[in-house]
From Swiss-Prot:
Signal peptide region: none
Active site: H100, D103
Protein encoded by which gene: xylA
Protein's organism: Rhizobium johnstonii (strain DSM 114642 / LMG 32736 / 3841)
Protein name: Xylose isomerase
One CC-aspect GO term: cytoplasm
Length: 436
């Protein structure tokens, strides 16, 4: 049954690249076969509950611009928001959604009230999922908005805050499991510091390690089959966050023996904030065996902060999905649109238009990436570049069968004098442009 929020808008359909209908897909066809697999199953799109239905449109210099009928902190409003959300998922044809606990339930005065409210809305979501076929990609706990978390959650100097946060995560894992969520995400928005003058880094990192171990232990205790994901971000809201980037998180996981238990949810905008390209973070996560899922958005390259805009750069998407496909594709992860409307985009249709554009952009990127893989457009030049390491002697060198003295003797006795070879960067950049 329609809520009426979207007026007479009908389910979004594919109309082809020549369509000028803003409420139609031009490139995204769920059933199109790409590399032997349905496009929908490659991309595994999800809608972010928080930016799409909870964000009021504020910024540091101005307050709310969106006037949504569910913007009240009551269970009645929470259920109306759920009605609109699941109608939106159906109109868009998104197979998945994601949420924080605070996005979906009213804020209670106590932990017990929060748990009661979450359980009630989870039961409501379960009915909605059954009726629409929409699934939960991942759930998570908001451990950053409430004032109790102003000094962190897991890294807070107050052990009672640590305990409250841990108990909250338990309820959110339970909710995620009940709804069939395929992943559970941890994002440390306040797990960092503003100044070292009042911060014991060593203690806070140890607290964070204990917290993450508790999560993994509980996952196994209850038999949750989903993947635990960490989402890196270098700063904002804190000056420096401990989950800075892929490399930093990997070192943290290794220290605590969790590199085989936890994978990463990598956001394009966060990669940019860390001074990396999106494809760098994806390639590194693949190389380290910790790639899990992605949050798809973009930042304004001039502003210097996290603007969470919908993706619109096909070459960037092509390179991103190239690394996703090259690593074997998503297992339990997917493409979550952690993107929000601009605060002047007031119309309900704008919510659909933003997602449609993002989905079309990702579809174009996926198809370009798949074609590059099928043609070995990048993999063959890469293999040629490193071909010298395939020789028997080079393999022994790589496996550590020669000492430094033996290597030196080889260089001297064979008069080794290697000459540099072209890296062909311009050629490869031109190759990519042929596909996009």
């Amino acid at each position: 049954m329609s809520t009426g929020f979207f007026g007479d808008i009908q389910k979004v359909k594919y109309e082809g690249p020549d369509s000028t209908n803003p409420l139609a897909f031009r490139h995204y066809q769920p059933d199109e076969i790409v590399m032997g697999k349905r496009m929908e199953d490659h991309l595994r799109f999800a809608v972010a509950y928080w930016h799409t239905f909870t964000w009021p449109g504020g910024d540091p210099f101005g307050g709310q611009t969106f006037l949504r009928p569910w913007f009240e902190d009551t269970m009645k409003a929470a259920k109306l928001k759920a009605d609109v959300a699941f109608e939106f998922f159906s109109l868009l044809g998104s197979p998945y959604y994601c949420f924080h606990d605070a996005d979906v339930r009213p804020e209670g005065k106590t932990f017990a009230e929060n748990t009661k409210n979450l359980n009630e809305i989870v039961d409501y979501f379960a009915e909605k999922q059954a009726a629409t076929g929409t699934k939960l990609l991942w759930g998570t706990a908001n451990l950053f908005s409430h004032r109790r978390y102003m000094s962190g959650a897991a890294t807070n100097p107050d052990p009672d805050v640590f305990a409250f946060a841990a108990a909250t995560v338990k309820t959110c894992i339970d909710a995620t499991q009940k709804l069939g969520g395929e992943n559970y995400v941890l994002w440390g928005g306040r797990e960092g510091y503003e100044t070292l003058l009042n911060t014991d880094i060593g203690r806070e990192l140890d607290q964070l390690g204990r917290f993450l171990n508790l999560v993994v232990e509980y996952k196994h205790k209850i038999g949750y089959k989903g993947t635990i994901l960490i989402e890196p971000k270098p700063q904002e809201p804190t000056k420096h966050q401990y989950d800075y980037d892929v490399a930093t998180v990997y070192g943290f996981l290794k220290k605590h023996g969790l590199e085989n238990e936890v994978k990463l949810n990598i956001e394009q905008g966060h990669a940019i904030l860390a001074g990396h390209s999106f494809e760098h973070e994806l390639a590194l996560a693949n190389a380290l065996g910790i790639f899990g899922s992605i949050d798809m958005n973009r930042n304004d390259y001039q502003s210097g902060w996290d603007t969470d805009q919908f993706p619109n750069n096909v070459p960037e998407m092509a390179l991103a999905y190239y690394h996703v496909l090259a690593g074997g594709g998503f297992k339990t992860g997917g493409t979550n649109f952690d993107s929000k409307l601009r605060r002047q985009s007031l119309d309900p249709a704008d919510l659909l238009i933003g997602h449609i554009g993002g989905m079309d952009c990702c579809a174009r990127g996926l198809k370009a990436a798949a074609k590059m893989i099928e043609d070995k457009a990048l993999s063959q030049p890469l293999a040629d570049r490193y071909a010298g390491w395939e020789s028997a002697e080079a393999q022994k060198l790589f496996r550590g069968e020669y000492s430094l003295d033996e290597i030196t003797h080889y260089v001297e006795s064979h008069d080794v004098n290697p000459q540099p070879r072209s890296g062909k960067q311009e050629l490869l950049e031109n190759v990519v442009n042929r596909y996009v």
